[in-house]
A protein has these predicted regions:
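Flexible, polar/low-complexity N-terminal or interdomain linker segments that lie immediately upstream
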Residues: 1-50
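Short active-site oxyanion
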Residues: 33-39, 56, 85, 109-110
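Alpha-helical elements of the RecA-like P-loop NTPase motor core of helicases
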Residues: 49, 67, 97-98
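Glycine-rich loop at the start of a catalytic domain that most often binds anionic cofactors/ligands
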Residues: 52-54
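Short, acidic/turn-prone active-site loops that include or flank metal/cofactor-
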Residues: 62-66
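Short, charged, surface-exposed secondary-structure boundary motifs
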Residues: 67-73
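Catalytic cysteine-centered active loop of the rhodanese-like fold, especially the PTP/DSP P-loop
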Residues: 73-114
Length: 114
């Protein structure tokens, strides 16, 4: 049986981009040394090995995001307890848009993405 997908990834990303603030690279470069911002790298281990990451960024594989944010999860990471702005990023701004929207819906704030 063929599945009837009623909302594809493009629509989900569009909704996320309508909801969450998007920063451009130039804006982010000025924030890299600002301690009020935490950069969250959503790429997987292979991407990090191949391409590296922003110095000081926290690596959070996309598949673990909700578990690491939720304080009731046994996988919770304390980095998500801070009163800072969370800047999510990935390779194409797709995962980062979806992640920032999800994090916002979970109550993490403020959030944005590259």
């Amino acid at each position: 049986m063929v599945q009837n997908i009623v909302k594809g990834y493009k629509a989900l990303i569009h909704e996320a981009n309508e909801t969450v603030k998007t920063l451009n690279v130039e804006e982010c470069q000025s924030l890299l040394k600002n301690e009020d911002y935490i950069f969250i790298d959503l790429r997987d281990f292979r991407e990090l090995q191949r391409e590296g990451k922003i110095p000081g960024a926290f690596s959070c594989p996309r598949g673990m995001l909700e578990f690491w944010i939720d304080q009731e999860s046994p996988y919770h990471k304390a980095i998500f307890n801070q009163d800072k702005t969370y800047v999510f990023y990935c390779a194409s701004a797709w995962r980062s848009a979806l992640s920032a929207k999800t994090a916002s819906e979970m109550g993490l704030a403020p959030v944005c993405h590259i």
